[in-house]
């Protein structure tokens, strides 16, 4: 086992990043399809497609919250487990895995109960109109029953990737996505279930992915295994995981809060078509964010392991390469969106009016996308080295300090209030990336100097 896991500290960084990031990026790209394939099919339901798409879009904030809770323990626990592996403390690494697993189950039970009891009320508060509430409620009610699958799949898959098994993590997503793509048209169109069919397809697909994850983590191929004796929550091990995971949780949960604010403002100033366009914009933004996060997740085991092993040279080298790759991707996608916005809109709907509206605002909404490579590289590296405070600062700054106030401030200052709501995103992005880069330049250097002094 010792010989197997040390490849994170010995193989060339460029080769390692390709080995770990490519499967993770593929998984994120497929996961992106997993997340948006429902919307593509729903948007093409005869006669009611546009309203149904808008209704499912209102569910997005709640779905983001469910996903965020999966990150609450795992996004902190997985890097901590990698750091323990770098220190050759496999016992603490496995206890971290077991404690996070148990905590994830408890969170799932609570979330399922909340969604079933108060889901409809939440949808109305989150921007559903009388025209879209029935579609939203139908989708969410069925989706709620798959909460356990979502939590364990997203949460525990992070521990698979953290051990360096990027391909296994990729298969987790491929299995679910393939099942979802096959089941969606059957349930939505062939069986005439509409949005309920889309939700059922998602739940069943997540169940398959969950089974795959648990079989691997209980098997002999994993370095870190789920063992009965480790399924207890040790505050000493879990609290640092939760503190570190709080940054990722804040980032994802804030997406939900921001989505609610966007939907409410857009419904007020632009009506259902503006909310429908926002559903498409959010999906397009996933084309940017998920692959970037995949690259960052591929780099995470390398950074965390070598940080734990006090190999600062490889930590620096990994960050430089991560930043370069992330920037190339974000700039390339930004150019495509700015040049061909209508192409992205047509993927989701055949409605000519919605396509025209979306194409116009997409250029505005994604204007700051080219800078995302810097944001993600710095953010993911903070998490990888266990810098909980800096991670939380970066997460809170962009969404709560900048974007949230701008959603309400800009419409009060500009004549075209609907456009002003969309403009809040790029303005916040530019300011946030600037602040993040400055913070990272000082804190990353300080963390490595401290590590070298204690070596």
Locate each region found by the language model.
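Short alpha-helical transmembrane segments in multi-pass integral membrane proteins
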Residues: 1-24, 81-148, 190-245, 303-368, ...
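N-terminal transmembrane alpha-helices
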Residues: 8-48, 61-76, 80, 84, ...
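Transmembrane helical elements of multi-pass membrane transporters/channels
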Residues: 19-38, 142, 176, 205-209, ...
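Helix-terminus/linker motif at the lipid-water interface of multi-pass membrane proteins
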Residues: 29, 33-53, 123-130, 186-193, ...
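Alpha-helical transmembrane segments of multipass membrane proteins
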Residues: 36-40, 113, 121, 155-159, ...
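Interfacial/gating helices of multi-pass transporter permease domains
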Residues: 42-64, 131-135, 195-196, 237-244, ...
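Small-residue-rich hydrophobic transmembrane alpha-helices
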Residues: 53-113, 150-169, 277-335, 339-341, ...
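Short runs within selected transmembrane alpha-helices of multi-pass transporters and secretion channels
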Residues: 74, 143-161, 169-177, 198-213, ...
């Amino acid at each position: 086992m010792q010989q197997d896991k040390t490849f994170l500290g010995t193989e060339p960084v460029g080769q390692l990043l390709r080995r770990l990031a490519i499967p993770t990026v593929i998984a994120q790209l497929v996961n992106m399809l997993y997340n948006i394939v429902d919307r593509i099919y729903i948007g093409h339901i005869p006669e009611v497609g546009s309203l149904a798409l808008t209704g499912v879009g209102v569910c997005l904030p709640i779905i983001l919250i469910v996903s965020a809770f999966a990150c609450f323990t795992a996004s902190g626990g997985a890097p901590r487990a990698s750091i323990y592996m770098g220190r050759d403390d496999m016992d603490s690494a496995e206890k971290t895995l077991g404690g996070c697993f148990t905590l994830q189950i408890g969170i799932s039970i609570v979330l399922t109960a909340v969604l079933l009891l108060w889901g409809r009320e939440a949808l109305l508060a989150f921007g559903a109109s009388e025209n879209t509430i029935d579609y939203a409620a139908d989708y969410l009610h069925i989706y709620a029953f798959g909460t356990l699958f979502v939590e364990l799949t997203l949460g525990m898959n992070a521990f698979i990737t953290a051990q360096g098994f990027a391909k296994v993590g990729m298969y987790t997503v491929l299995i679910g996505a393939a099942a979802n793509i096959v089941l969606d048209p059957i349930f939505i169109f062939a069986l005439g279930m509409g949005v309920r069919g889309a939700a059922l397809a998602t739940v069943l697909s997540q169940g398959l992915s969950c089974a795959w994850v648990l079989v691997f983590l209980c098997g002999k191929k994993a370095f870190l295994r789920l063992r009965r004796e480790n399924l207890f929550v040790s505050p000493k091990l879990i609290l640092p995981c939760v503190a570190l995971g709080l940054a990722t949780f804040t980032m994802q949960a804030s997406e939900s809060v921001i989505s609610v604010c966007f939907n409410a403002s857009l419904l007020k100033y632009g009506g259902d078509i503006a909310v429908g366009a926002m559903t498409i914009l959010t999906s397009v933004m996933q084309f940017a964010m998920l692959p970037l996060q995949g690259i960052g997740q591929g780099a995470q085991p390398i950074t965390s392991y070598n940080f734990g092993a006090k190999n600062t040279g490889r930590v620096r080298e990994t960050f430089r390469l991560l930043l370069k790759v992330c920037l190339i991707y974000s700039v390339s996608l930004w150019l495509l969106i700015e040049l061909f916005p209508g192409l992205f809109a047509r993927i989701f709907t055949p409605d000519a009016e919605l396509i025209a509206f979306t194409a116009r605002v997409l250029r505005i909404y994604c204007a700051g996308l080219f800078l995302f490579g810097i944001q993600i590289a710095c953010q993911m590296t903070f998490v990888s080295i266990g810098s909980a405070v800096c991670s939380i600062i970066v997460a809170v700054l962009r969404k709560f300090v900048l974007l949230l106030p701008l959603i309400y401030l800009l419409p009060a200052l500009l004549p075209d209030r609907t456009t002003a709501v969309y403009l809040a995103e790029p303005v916040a992005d530019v300011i946030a990336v600037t602040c993040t880069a400055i913070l990272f330049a000082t804190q990353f250097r300080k963390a490595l100097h401290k590590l070298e002094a204690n070596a």
